[in-house]
Amino acid sequence: MLKKKPVSFSCIDGHIYKIFPNDLNANNTVFGGLLMSLLDRLALVVAERHTESVCVTAFVDALRFYAPAYMGENLICKAAVNRTWRTSLEVGVKVWAENIYKQERRHITSAYFTFVAVNEDNQPIPVHQIVPETPEEKRRYNEADRRRQARLELK
């Protein structure tokens, strides 16, 4: 039976990833591919918590790198369901780099991931509805639908 769930049911807020030397590229900044993988994994956890089923990544929208992150910094991550449709949902992910020695935090990357919930035969299945409660959640809910409409127009 499909349910209505609040954003808080499945969100991740404050996940921390410590940057070590093996996370760096040739410029001694965090490797972009590592960030992309981290974002996809966090978004997947949120999607599967919400749907209570296996989900597959269908689309990545607006993935942007705003600033570099460096060795020794912490990556602070937030991910939440923005909107659900019949068999899919959008999860927004945002990451900040934290330098605890300088007492600074800066936004380094964000993205929107669309997932499709699937059954054991890899066929799409209906997902639970999301219930936005706060003004911020309602804003993200509406913006997610605009992004989806823009994607559908590109087809």
Curated annotation (Swiss-Prot):
Keywords: Hydrolase. PROSITE patterns: HOTDOG_ACOT. GO terms for biological process: acyl-CoA metabolic process. Its EC number is 3.1.2.-. Residues 9-121 form the HotDog ACOT-type domain. GO terms for molecular function: long-chain fatty acyl-CoA hydrolase activity. It is an enzyme of class 3 (hydrolase). One of its GO terms (cellular component) is cytosol. Signal peptide: none annotated. It holds the Pfam family 4HBT. Belongs to the acyl coenzyme A hydrolase family. This is Uncharacterized acyl-CoA thioester hydrolase CPn_0654/CP_0093/CPj0654/CpB0680. It comes from Chlamydia pneumoniae.
